[in-house]
Amino acid sequence: MNEGSSLVHLLRNLPVNLLIRALERDGFTLRRSTRTGGRIYAHSDGRITVVHYHHGSDTLTRKTLKSVLEAVGWTLDDAKRLGLVP
């Protein structure tokens, strides 16, 4: 199992509001919201990701979570630093 898929496995039940808090702690800011519930977050170094947000307690599907994690470029060490993984 590679690091990306293991990170998805560890974060598969993470509520969206906790993922958004971690994005903001990592320096991402809300660029804009779409009419369909998507929130576009951007980092000063040029990374951009879209998080679909309807209810804070919702979780993302594994495929969507993997896409977000690939876009932000987090590793397991980053997830630990941001408090997502013990």
Model-inferred region functions:
Residues 1-86:
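Basic nucleic-acid-binding interfaces
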